[in-house]
Amino acid sequence: MSGRFKDQVAIVTGAVGGIGSAIVEGFLAEGGRGGVIDFNAQGGQAYEKGLRKRGHEACFVHADVARFEECQAAYERISAELGPATILVNNVGISPKTDGRALKVWEMPPREWENVVAVNLNSVFYMTHLATPHMVRERQGRVINMSSVAGRAYCDIVAAHYAATKAGLIGLTRHWAAELGEHQVTVNALAPGRISTPLLKTVPKEINDAVAQVTALRRLGTPEEVADACLFFASDQARFVTGQVLDVAGGWLMT
């Protein structure tokens, strides 16, 4: 399997830490070049330095992906340094809580709703809008959107804005798969369950334990397990797979 992505450029948003980093490192390990976009400027610069020290071709760009002009600048910078991308992973996502709790509709400030929609949904349109012209011209491309099991079934540990945006990504995935198919560009989505990321360390242990107990495999997933599924969608092995949503959830909230 080594070298599946030799000389291919993959752009990953929300790529500093957790699932995003696992995806970037998966591409790099198999010969790819990694465009890393994240809001964490200090962490991103250190991450890029570490990747380059290990001999990888990587380019970090600090950006607020809720703003189109910053997405555009990031895409252009990565294209200039690494070449145009044939793989785009829209991984970025936020799920705000207040005192560790997801707010109900009557409690949620409209600004919070707007911010989640901007980051989780608008950014996916922006990045896909920017990346697909090259893919269409080359008749080669992979777009992978990071949805969630919360976009497929009710999940009481997230708020409505997160569920709505992740469900929206499923709709975009299917629509774009139909639009781009004749150009040999595939569009698929992943729907992770509870994944053991650094962010989960801020969640009370009893919540994660409860999720593990109602998951068929009786454990949380790892970022690397999500990355493995992402790399499959991005690979030539998935060239005849498009418009699909793959749960990576260990049997939690099976749909």
Briefly describe each language-model feature range.
Residues 2, 99, 153, 231, ...:
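Short C-terminal tail/terminal secondary-structure segment
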Residues 16-17:
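Conserved glycine-rich cofactor-binding loop
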Residues 86, 94, 106-126, 140, ...:
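Catalytic Tyr-X3-Lys loop
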Residues 99-105, 109-117, 200, 211:
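Substrate-binding pocket helix/loop in short-chain dehydrogenase/reductase
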Residues 128, 165, 173:
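Active-site helix of classical SDR
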Residues 133, 152, 177-179, 239:
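Alpha-helical segment proximal to the catalytic Tyr-Lys
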Residues 181, 186, 241-243:
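Short, small/polar-rich loop/turn modules that mediate ligand/substrate recognition or access, typified
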